[in-house]
Amino acid sequence: MSKTTFIIIAVIIILLLLALLGFLFYWRHRYRHTPTPPSSGPPVTPATPASITKAMQSGWGTIENQGNCLTATSNPGANTSIELQTCINPSSDNSSQQWKMTGNNSFISKLDPNGTYCLDVDGTASVGSSDQIHFWQCQQQDTTKMGWTPKITTNNPLNYQLVNNKTTSACLDASPGINKQPILQTCGANTTASQQWVFKPISS
C-alpha cells in the first residue's frame, strides 16, 4: 500500500468517525426524554376586598372561624344574641347560620331575609372595648357600627379579617370561644386565629 493510499484511507476513517459522533450527539439531544414536571393544579386567584364583598352580597353563605359558624341564636330582634357555634351541615336547615351582606356592607340573617335587623356591635365600638355582637335595627349608612369591610390576610389568601366601619382598627373576634358571643377587638396581626374569617357560599 502506498503512502498516499494509506493517508486517504486514514482521512476517510476519521471523517466517518466524526460523522458517527455527530449523529450520536444529535440523536441524544433530539430524542432524549425530558420528564414532565408535576402539575401543581390551576393557580389560585388571589382574593381582593372587592371580590369578597361581591361574593357576600351575591347570595347566602356561612361566616366561619376555625370551622365554627356565626349563628343567630333565635329569630332576629333588638338585642338578639349572635354566637359562634358548631357548623350545621348545609343539607340540614342551617338558616340560622346563613348570612348575606347588604349594599351598605351590613350583614343580615336568613332568618330575617328582608333585613329588618343587622349584625351590630353592642356598645361604643371603640378599639379594645370587647363589645359583644348582637342584632339591632338596620341603619342605612355603611359607616355605622353595622358596616364591615373584609381585609385580606397575607398568610392565607382565603381568610380575612372583618373590620368594623365605625372604628377601622377593630375587628370581629371569636376569642370568647364556642357557644359565646364574638366581640369587637383591636385588629391583630395576620396570624391572629380568632380574627380569621371565611365566607362560604351556600349552593341553592
From Swiss-Prot:
Disulfide bonds join 69-87, 118-138, 171-187. PROSITE patterns: RICIN_B_LECTIN (PS50231). SUPFAM superfamilies: Ricin B-like lectins. Signal peptide: none annotated. GO terms for molecular function: carbohydrate binding. InterPro entries: Ricin_B-like_lectins, Ricin_B_lectin. Keywords: Disulfide bond, Glycoprotein, Lectin, Membrane, Transmembrane, Transmembrane helix. It is found in: Membrane. It holds the Pfam family Ricin_B_lectin. It is a single-pass membrane protein. Its main location: membrane. The chain crosses the membrane at residues 6-26. Residues 52-200 form the Ricin B-type lectin domain. Glycans are attached at residues 79, 94, 104, 114, 165, 190. One of its GO terms (cellular component) is membrane. This is Putative B-type lectin protein L288.
